Amino acid sequence: MAKVIGIDLGTTNSAMAVYEGNEAKIIANKEGKNTTPSIVAFTDKGEILVGEPAKRQAVTNPKKTVYSIKRIMGLMFNEDKAKEAEKRLPYNIVDRNGACAVEIADKIYTPQEISAKILMKLKEDAQSYLGEDVTEAVITVPAYFNDSQRKATKEAGTIAGLNVLRIINEPTSAALAYGLDKKEAEKIMVYDLGGGTFDVTVLETGDNVVEVLATGGDAFLGGDDFDNRIIDWAAEEFKSDEGIDLKNDVMALQRLKDAAENAKKELSSAQETEINLPFITADASGPKHLVKKITRAKFESLIDDLIEDTIKKIEFVIKDAGLSQSDISEVVMVGGSTRIPKVQERVKAFISKDLNKSVNPDEVVAVGAAIQGGVLKGDVKDVLLLDVTPLSLGIETAGGISTKVVERGVTIPTKKTQIFSTYEDNQPAVSINVLQGERELARDNKSLGRFDLSGIPAAPRGVPQIEVTFDIDANGILTVSAKDKATGKSQEIKISGSSGLSDAEIEKMVKEAELHKEEDTKKKAIIELRNNADSLVYQTKKSLEEFKDKIESAEVEKIQSAVAALEETLKNENASKEELEEKIKNLTEVSHKLAEAAYAKEQGGTQQGTDTKKKDDDVIDAEVE
């Protein structure tokens, strides 16, 4: 049976592993290394280099050497993070159909295509190691990758000729590799700080089950950012000394990047190191050399705020899981950047627990992916992974209310269905605005996408039944569909993720939801009251048309007057809750005679049965544009 390889497709380095002989083993690449630089280069001769060969020539070919492509995977070109990446990366980032792509020698490549070249290299090396074709893989992604980023990763695998059996979250994968599923029931925290992304996840493990309780992170925080702090510091020092800005010279900047990365690594074991770059640039007076000593203390001061950001996210995720620091039994450190002493020190101080560093942080995620591959192939028995939705999902309904369909923290895969209806008579279509967030009003949440369901037969408002289904698969990819139950017509959208959320946005949204909870509840109550008032006016007018000859003309005038008064109040957008309630009460009271006439007709058997009415009561008015 063909082997499934587990792949950690990293920002700076990638790794692969395979499950064989009842254990997961790291596969070395053709160069004999356990990790492969996630770098692709295009030479003037038309060659494409991947991994170590690409890294070696980066200094002399910065414009055609692509690294950290994961940072723009699934990113829209107009996002702030794309602009930030443009400033930092020496190659050209361009707009391709609204999404980020790279331009090399007048040719445009998507992040999926670049990533696919890395995956192809890993695939070929795995085939060489195993002595057989490799066609299936499990690929890991940061827990906080949005739908677009997950899809882009899967597409990269497809381009590389791999059937991606599962996209698995990196912290969950790490928990498998540490064998945490075999222990007694415990609450585990995985702190994953890699080259370009940060994840923190709280899991409950034991009895062969790994269940995610809460997750958070930042898709744009990692070792690259630590390197950038050294680059900025060294460039500023050089500018102060020589009056030359190295950031305007891409070749000098690439040399400085390599030196900064090496300095960072050396400072994990040494108290001081030297950045020594002879002939870094030149001016009219001759060549210039950059020679700067940097101490560990200086490096720690440069990155202190970034480390504190990770601590804040730990605090947020533990709270989101409904736990306190004392509930955490074990802290697992994952990712190359966790080798930095200051990172270890701060995490240990915050959690007050010794850190689990028993597995190589660069390899652990790939090992876990290989174990998951074994699970999917049936080679590993009785292991169950349970991931969760990070935020609630729903749609916009009448009056701009956000109606939740899938609550935050629901275990995936999941499928939820809810029935909605039309807001106006003879409405031919409904517009579905898919939302993500915890706020009561649609405008305060994130819109993930919109689609229309048309061809609804003419019918009074509230009669059509529109079945809206949210389907989240095991990869965390969302599909939303809407179906008119009468005609069977349906429409669906696979959420593009163009409005995907960073963890900072998540935290902000959750905090805002808490902060504005009372205010939101009041606003929602007013909107619902207005919806009820509008519905009452509609039903009263309809009943009046049908039964006005059954009641006295004086009663008809009273009802018409009360309807007009309520309509006038509804025209006032600032009408208070009390005003609305008073007018609703008045119309309800004067309409008693009308209700009696309607009831008398129903008793006569000319009205539809109560079962239909009861069914309609459960239908929610859908917002239509």
Swiss-Prot record:
This is Chaperone protein DnaK. The keyword DNA-binding does not apply. It comes from Helicobacter hepaticus (strain ATCC 51449 / 3B1). Acts as a chaperone. CDD domains: ASKHA_NBD_HSP70_DnaK-like. The lineage of its organism: Bacteria, Pseudomonadati, Campylobacterota, Epsilonproteobacteria, Campylobacterales. GO terms for molecular function: ATP binding; ATP-dependent protein folding chaperone; unfolded protein binding. Belongs to the heat shock protein 70 family. The modification Phosphothreonine is found at T197. The keyword Chaperone applies. Induction: By stress conditions e.g. heat shock. Residues 598-625 are annotated as: Disordered. InterPro entries: ATPase_NBD (IPR043129), Chaperone_DnaK (IPR012725), Heat_shock_70_CS (IPR018181), HSP70_C_sf (IPR029048), HSP70_peptide-bd_sf (IPR029047), Hsp_70_fam (IPR013126). Transmembrane segments: none annotated. Keywords: ATP-binding, Chaperone, Nucleotide-binding, Phosphoprotein, Stress response.
